[in-house]
Amino acid sequence: MGKTISIKVLFGIYLLLMAGKVFAFSCNVDGGSSIGAGTTSVYVNLDPVIQPGQNLVVDLSQHISCWNDYGGWYDTDHINLVQGSAFAGSLQSYKGSLYWNNVTYPFPLTTNTNVLDIGDKTPMPLPLKLYITPVGAAGGVVIKAGEVIARIHMYKIATLGSGNPRNFTWNIISNNNVVMPTGGCTVDSRNVTVDLPDFPGSAEIPLGVYCSSEQKLSFYLSGATTDSSRQVFANTAPDATKASGVGVTLMRNGKILATGENVSLGTVNKSKVPLGLSATYGQTGNKVSAGTVQSVIGVTFIYE
């Protein structure tokens, strides 16, 4: 009988030791429950930031933290990101860079990263940021809420014994609809609605542009016009409410702009440069009748 009890006690100790090893390394997302391995969704509010030579997609140090359950650097965990980590969804065809543990790597990853050591019980935010490389002038790609924008693979192994290796995959998912800037320059709004006061009033157009590095930019207007000078944009309001004899003109520094006319903005950098545009009515006939005036006008930016 004593022998049987002794065997059960030893067996119980063995199980406890194994359980302790299984939970020696953990992570969480946004302070949630502990994650020991496998695939986890990381929901992020995307707020792209233009930076010199690159556009910040997301700072994941604000979301993912990991720690060593033993603490005291007794059995240190060694963490690295794994080749094959890449953008996904609407960003799948783009290239960028990944910041990890004081080193920046081309992204998608074609090699494993350096190793981050974690040996403390205090959750450590992972030093991890994603950037997209600008590919031209002002441009962007629409990302929808719920879309996976990147998959990052992570490997962990400890110092003692077999190291209890683990694999993690972080699926980075957008919480919001956003236009991700993919160009060296971008505008502060891609769809601007301007309400004009009653005829013959005017209104400022709140539109500006900024760039990740210094660029000489110009822009031009496009859209259907009604006059030979290409300065009065057509009234596209529904016929039932449409005003007659009037369209819309855009002005800059007191000068009416024509479609296709290049307007230089000079050198643009990270500080927003307002386009300085205002909208007003443009008369197209001798007589103006009351009604709705509506025009759709495009603004295209080009490198000088």
Swiss-Prot record:
It comes from the Bacteria. Pfam families: FimH_man-bind. Residues 1-26 form the signal peptide. One of its GO terms (biological process) is cell adhesion involved in single-species biofilm formation. It is found in: Fimbrium. GO terms for cellular component: pilus. The keyword Signal applies. Keywords: Fimbrium, Signal. Belongs to the fimbrial protein family. This is Uncharacterized fimbrial-like protein YdeQ. It comes from Escherichia coli (strain K12).
